[in-house]
C-alpha cells in the first residue's frame, strides 16, 4: 500500500494585551504576559511603589533564566535597600556586562569594597559611564576611610 504524507503549517498571531488589561492579567494569570508586557505594566507605577517592585519580582520568577528580568528585579531590590537579595539575583547573571554596575553598587552597599571595585572597574572598562562615576565615588570613599 502507498503511504500518504500530510503536512500542515499552522500560523497564528498572539494578541498583545493593552496595559490596563495586562494589569488585571498580572494578578490572575501572569504566565499569559510576555516580559515586555510586564515591563509596560511596571512603568505605569511610581518607581518606589510596592506594585513596581512586585511586577519585577513576578517577572523574575516567571522568567528565571532571562538576564533582563533578573537585572530589573535586582535593581528594585537595590533601590529598596535589600542588597543581599539584589546580589543573589545578580550572581546568576554575573557574566553579563549589563549586571556589573549594579553588582558593584550592591557589593559596596553590602560593605565588600574589594568586590565592588572589581565589578565597577569591569563595567567602566566595558564602557558604562554610570559605573565609571560610581567607581570614582567609591575610590574617594575608600581613600577617606
Language-model region placement:
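N-terminal targeting segments with Sec-dependent signals, encompassing both cleavable signal peptides
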Residues: 1-145
